[in-house]
Amino acid sequence: MRKLEVSEQITKEAKKIISEGEGETQEVIDMCDFATGLSRQLYGLTMPSERPNHRLQEIWQPLGVVGCVTAFNFPVAVFGLSLI
């Protein structure tokens, strides 16, 4: 239900047509769904690297408060991607 409200706000602020506002809102929803799925796959694995004497390690490190400067043409999509 909030999707339409967010889409309308994007349309007003970014001077877009409503279908573009809805598309951008759906894009952020899809990004959040994808990130939620990725969080379930974080096991703290240690893997070999292609670089000699290096290893890859999955570590969960919350960032805390984050600021984001977004482009005018895709304000919500850029913000959503920054959250992930």
What residue spans do the PLM features occupy?
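N-terminal Rossmann-like NAD(P)+-binding subdomain of aldehyde/semialdehyde dehydrogenases
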Residues: 1-54, 84
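Conserved small-residue-rich beta-alpha loop and adjacent elements
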Residues: 45-84
